[in-house]
Amino acid sequence: MSVALMWEARAVAGRGDELLAWARERTLALAVAPLRHETLRAPQDRVLVITWWDAAYDADLPELPEPDPDLVTRAVHRWRFETA
């Protein structure tokens, strides 16, 4: 089964590049490498990371942590999806 983990955060205004770099570094430093990963950006300094895993939906998988509170405007949003 294939599982996708999504992680989305919004940087403090003007710090989107810093959040993007932070997310890229943390994705590459995960304890176990995902099958695939993508890092995307959007207006309002938002960053989205999607990782794909060959695992059960409820598997214990490594996830990106919360960034420092001074880098983001709110708590990270997280979603987990399975292949339909």
Residue ranges: model-predicted function:
Residues 1, 35-48, 64-84:
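Glycine-rich beta-strand-turn "strand-cap" elements at beta-sheet edges
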Residues 2, 26-28, 54-58:
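N-terminal processing/targeting junctions
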Residues 2-11:
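Short glycine-/aliphatic-rich beta-strand segments at the starts of folded cytosolic domains
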Residues 7, 52-53:
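Signature tryptophan residues that serve as conserved aromatic anchors
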Residues 11-13, 54-55, 82-83:
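Non-catalytic surface loops within mature trypsin-like serine protease
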Residues 11-36, 64-67:
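Short amphipathic alpha-helical segments
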Residues 17, 25, 59, 77-78:
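A generic structural micro-environment signature
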Residues 17, 47, 54-63:
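Short amphipathic alpha-helices within nucleic acid-binding modules
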